[in-house]
Structure formats: structure tokens, C-alpha cells
Amino acid sequence: MNQGKIITVSGPLVVASGMQEANIQDICRVGHLGLVGEIIEMRRDQASIQVYEETSGIGPGEPVVTTGCPLSVELGPGLISEMFDGIQRPLDRFQKATDSDFLIRGVAIPSLDRKAKWAFIPKLSVGQEVVAGDILGTVQETAVIEHRIMVPYKVSGTLVAIHAGDFTVTDTVYEIKQEDGSIYQGSLMQTWPVRQSRPVAQKLIPVEPLVTGQRVIDTFFPVTKGGAAAVPGPFGAGKTVVQHQIAKFANVDIVIYVGCGERGNEMTDVLNEFPELIDPNTGQSIMERTVLIANTSNMPVAAREASIYTGITIAEYFRDMGYSVAIMADSTSRWAEALREMSGRLQEMPGDEGYPAYLGSRIAEYYERAGRVRTLGSQEREGTITAIGAVSPPGGDISEPVTQNTLRIVKVFWGLDAPLAQRRHFPAINWLTSYSLYQDDVGSYIDRKQQSNWSNKVTRAMAILQREASLEEIVRLVGLDSLSEQDRLTMAVARQIREDYLQQNAFDSVDTFTSFPKQEAMLTNILTFNEEASKALSLGAYFNEIMEGTAQVRDRIARSKFIPEENLEQIKGLTQKVTKEIHHVLAKGGI
């Protein structure tokens, strides 16, 4: 422990002298109030400290004390359903302890509740050899999540004691005799530095799709479990709603939602909505599998920078248990702005648009902690982290540095489009500019698992939308009637795909989520209509007669998005109805 004194205060940056024994990334207590700070630069005996709390009233001459430890998070039972700030302070217990609706400075509250007791059930017995990552026992944390207590990293040896019963997170639950003869006494909790990724046995290629229930994503731009996706878009295009929808309905075990520098009412929406929503995969409340990290725009800027790392470290902990985890960061642009502010105060050489030169490597560090892995431990298991980051480019200009550096790393780009949002087409993901590099892997995975021709259907649907885009210029110049019958059909089918399939109402109880079998049935109906109508045109039928003769069945296809999942056979039955109606048009002569 080293004590120095403040010589300069510049917003969230404090410079202290007499810190020659301190190290970069050490946590400090700053000033008489004991504010939490982290050393981000050392020059001789002077340390530049990033303070995670408001620094007003702090002045030169006040003491700075280092703890000798890096910024770390507590990992153990009690994380799920909890809401933390950027440095893992529990906000509900903070409010009760301080009796204030605001963050009182200098208050230290442990991240995990020290009084709560958890029922520990051992899975191993005394005398067994254990290595780092082995599961010693379980705690039923919520109705959905079984918390697996693991041997900490760099600990291995013979299990000499393990106890069943109710324990707090600090009680000794097991003892391991290590190779050097020392006894390691372990509890239900472990700590981990947030800026250091947790080790794994092996990184694997992600192949299984993350089913989000959003048709435009699952069909055209899928992301895999263990993949990374970016959602850039201008103000009002629906970035936060897309993130909320994925957090609500994705087929993952655990969701970490990081509200980083966005508006406070968006986190309020999460807190109000999530407890009432039922997870379609488990039948339980969505909060039973969610961890919230709130670092809204009116909280200290420096803590934004830490909040992303706090979230990904908690995600890695649950991944190591063998769970599939999704982490939402809303928004990484605000995080990058925090980096820019600290870089400016350190008087570093600026890069593009004032962002630090190391912006690209910091963004890469975050997204590279996602992935599908084989975890440490003698019991073989796999875990995944899917990272989905919203990007808020000023004015929707995706050529700015944060978006460009993000797109170099992620493999999925869901480009939100202001004109689509203005036309009230939501999700406003532009199908012509967005892309997914997982499309082929996911398509072949689904074809193999479902024994269906899914990837071919997706290719045909996208070809229709692209053909529509190339015809739109002609239509604007000379009108729809100037097109050939086949091209008019293409325009009509493309409109069906856009309005009846891609457009989705997040606030409708049925349309908000679409399972994969329902998506396949809906898309099959539209493509069947296109195929049968094309045949009818080639046999001499007129476009107008086909449209008039199939008006009723097309209306039923349009309404199929509002048919509940349990009535899936109604949607599948429309395929034969489409064929029958078009054959009926041909039987009448079609001329």
C-alpha cells in the first residue's frame, strides 16, 4: 500500500505525486472522501488516476492511497437479477444503505450480498484430484440458473474438505491441498480483474445460430452463438429496441445488458418490462436469467469505460460454467467517447476525430473476448459469449472511427436505416446494406439439423428484394405499368416479403417473437406464391387476374404473422391453398 498526495485535478483525471511504489491499473482511494480511482499512467513518481466518481470538491494536497489490486469484479451467487453500476456496485442495496436516490461519493458496498445464504450441494467428494475449472458443486441461484461453483484459476490438488449446507459467499466451503503442501480455503465467491480475459482450454468455431425471434435477423443476417454483431444507426432508428428484443427472446441461458452512457429512461424501461415478460424457452420471468449494468449518461464518464469490461468479465464467468451468454452493450460509441475524454485530459496525441490512436485495439480487445470455447477443467464442457454492440454514429454517418473500427472486427452488420424508420418499417434493418459472414455456416447447419432447404429459400427471397431495388429506378421514372408481367410480379412479391415478413411489431404480444418453424412456414408461403404465379404467367395468365384471384389467400399470408405459435398448422396449410387458388385462375382460362 502506497500513499501519495494530489497535485492536479482535471475533471475525472487526478494526478498524484509520491506514488513511486504504485503500479498501472492499481485501484486507489482518492481524497478525504476515499473516491474509487484507477491508475492509467505512471511518469516517475506521478500517477494519473481515472476517478470513477464525481471529483468536485477534491483539491491538491489531499491523500491518495493505493490498494495494490487491479479493478476486479466479485463472481459468485447473487449476480443474476441484480443491477450494478459500471464498477459493480449494487444499485438497490446502495440506495437502501445511503437512503438516497443518488450515488453518494466514497461509499463502499460489497458487490455480492454478504448476509444472503445459499444452499450449496457438493458434486465431488473428499480425496478426489481437482484442477482449475472443475465444478465442485452447485447453488440454485434462480428458478432457471444453476450456479456452478468452480475451482479458481491456478488452484489444483487434492480435495481435503467439502461441506454441504447454507453458506454466505465468504464462508469457507471447501479446502484443497495443493502440490506445495499448502491448503487453499475456498468460498462460493472468487474475484477476477476486469481487464484480463479469463483463460480457456481451446477456442472453437461458432456454428449454432442464435435464434432471436426477429425475422429479418434470423433469416437474412443471422449471428451464431459465440459470434459478434454491431448495430449502427442514427438517432431514432431503433437500436435500443433491437437490443431489448434480443435480450428478451434470444435462445441463450444468460443475458448481460450493459447500458453504457445511454439515457436513464431506457434502463427504466428494462427494469419495468423484463420482470413481467416470460422467457419462451423456460416459461420463467426474463429477469431470472439477466444481469443489468447501468451506467447512464448522467453518471460519471470514467465509469463508462469500466462498465463494458465489468459486463464481459461476468459473461466469461458464466461461460466457464458451460452456459451460452449474450452480452448487449448500448452503446459502444458512448464508451469510446469516455476513452476520448480521458485521452484528451492525458494530453495524448489524438487520432481520427479526436479519438485516441489505440481506439481500434481497445474495441478489438472487447469483441475478441466473445466466442465459443472449450472451458478449463477435467469435465469437458463448452460455453459461448455472443457480443452485440450498438453504435451511435453522429448523424448516422458510419464512416466515423468507432463504426469503422467495429466493422473491422465483427462479422455481422445490422445497418439501421433512417428512411426505413421514417416509413415506420421496424426493425429498420436495411436488407441491401447489412450483411452476415455467418450466413453460409448457419444455412448449412439448419439444412443439416432441420432436413430442410432453408438456405435456398433465403437466397431466393434475397434475390427478389435485390431485383426490386434494381427495378425501383425504372418505376420512379416511367411507372409500374411499363414493366413486364414478370417484373410486376417480382415487385408484388418483394412488397409481400417487406411488409408481411420483414416488418415486425415489437409491441404486439404475438408478432414480437417468431419461432424458427413459424418463420420457415411464413417464408415458404410467400415463395410458393411467387413460384406458382410465375408458372401461371408462363402459361398465359395475366398478372392482374392472378392478383385478383389470389387476393383472399394473400391477405391470409399477410395476417399469418399474428397467428400464435400453437396454431402453426394454419400457416403451413396456406401453401396448398396458394397452389389451389392459382390453379383455379388458370382453370378459368387466365386470358
Curated annotation (Swiss-Prot):
Sorted UniProt keywords: ATP synthesis, ATP-binding, Hydrogen ion transport, Ion transport, Nucleotide-binding, Translocase, Transport
One Gene Ontology cellular component annotation held by this UniProt entry: proton-transporting ATP synthase complex
GO MF assignments: ATP binding; proton-transporting ATP synthase activity, rotational mechanism; proton-transporting ATPase activity, rotational mechanism
GO biological process, any: proton motive force-driven plasma membrane ATP synthesis
Annotated Gene3D superfamilies: 2.40.30.20, 2.40.50.100, Bovine Mitochondrial F1-atpase, Atp Synthase Beta Chain, Chain D, domain 3 (1.10.1140.10), P-loop containing nucleotide triphosphate hydrolases (3.40.50.300)
Binding-site residues for ATP, renumbered to this chain: 233-240
The enzyme's E.C. designation: 7.1.2.2
Record-linked InterPro entries: ATP-synt_VA_C, ATP-synth_a_Xtn, ATP_synth_asu-like_sf, ATPase_a/bsu_AS, ATPase_F1/V1/A1_a/bsu_N, ATPase_F1/V1/A1_a/bsu_N_sf, ATPase_F1/V1/A1_a/bsu_nucl-bd, ATPase_F1/V1_b/a_C
Pfam families: ATP-synt_ab, ATP-synt_ab_N, ATP-synt_ab_Xtn, ATP-synt_VA_C
Reactions catalysed, as given in the entry: ATP + H2O + 4 H(+)(in) = ADP + phosphate + 5 H(+)(out)
Function noted in UniProt: Produces ATP from ADP in the presence of a proton gradient across the membrane. The V-type alpha chain is a catalytic subunit.
Family: Belongs to the ATPase alpha/beta chains family.
Name by which UniProt lists this protein: V-type ATP synthase alpha chain
Species classification: Bacteria, Bacillati, Bacillota, Bacilli, Lactobacillales
